[in-house]
């Protein structure tokens, strides 16, 4: 399983996330949140199927590039406490 803080290839060059046609506007708040959800859904699904979580790394990199650290920390605390509003 990829670590919640940093997957295996944490070091190195992280390119800017590519354009996502679902979020064409300059404000990338929704893009950040959606990639956070997609990452956690991907991890959950891959673990359930007993497969490698390596494909989930893309979502991890995107949300870590777009989201403020304080948001990510708060969302992780909410997931841990069972109060996160998103559907994972």
Curated annotation (Swiss-Prot):
One Gene Ontology biological process: oxidative phosphorylation
Gene Ontology cellular component list: mitochondrial crista; mitochondrion; respiratory chain complex IV
Disulfide bond entries: 32-67, 42-56
Location, primary (coarse class): mitochondrion
Entry's localization field: Mitochondrion inner membrane
CDD domains: Cyt_c_Oxidase_VIb
Tissue: Testis specific.
InterPro entries assigned: COX6B-like (IPR048280), CX6/COA6-like_sf (IPR036549), Cyt_c_oxidase_su6B (IPR003213)
Motif Cx10C motif, residue numbers: 56-67
Record motif Cx9C motif, residues: 32-42
Key word ATP-binding present: no
Recorded superkingdom: Eukaryota
Signal peptide range in chain numbering: none
Domain CHCH as annotated: residue spans: 29-75
Keywords annotated in UniProt: Disulfide bond, Membrane, Mitochondrion, Mitochondrion inner membrane
Family the entry assigns: Belongs to the cytochrome c oxidase subunit 6B family.
Summary of the function given for this chain in its UniProt record: Component of the cytochrome c oxidase, the last enzyme in the mitochondrial electron transport chain which drives oxidative phosphorylation. The respiratory chain contains 3 multisubunit complexes succinate dehydrogenase (complex II, CII), ubiquinol-cytochrome c oxidoreductase (cytochrome b-c1 complex, complex III, CIII) and cytochrome c oxidase (complex IV, CIV), that cooperate to transfer electrons derived from NADH and succinate to molecular oxygen, creating an electrochemical gradient over the inner membrane that drives transmembrane transport and the ATP synthase.
Subunit text: Component of the cytochrome c oxidase (complex IV, CIV), a multisubunit enzyme composed of 14 subunits. The complex is composed of a catalytic core of 3 subunits MT-CO1, MT-CO2 and MT-CO3, encoded in the mitochondrial DNA, and 11 supernumerary subunits COX4I1 (or COX4I2), COX5A, COX5B, COX6A2 (or COX6A1), COX6B1 (or COX6B2), COX6C, COX7A1 (or COX7A2), COX7B, COX7C, COX8B and NDUFA4, which are encoded in the nuclear genome.
Protein name: Cytochrome c oxidase subunit 6B2
Organism (species): Bos taurus (Bovine)
């Amino acid at each position: 399983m990829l670590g919640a803080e940093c997957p295996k290839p944490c070091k190195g060059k992280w390119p800017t996330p590519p354009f996502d046609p679902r979020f064409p506007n300059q404000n990338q708040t929704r893009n950040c949140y959606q990639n956070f959800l997609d990452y956690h859904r991907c991890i959950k699904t891959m673990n359930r199927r007993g497969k490698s979580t390596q494909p989930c790394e893309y979502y991890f990199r995107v949300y870590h590039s777009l989201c403020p650290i304080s948001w990510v920390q708060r969302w992780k605390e909410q997931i841990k406490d069972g109060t996160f509003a998103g559907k994972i």
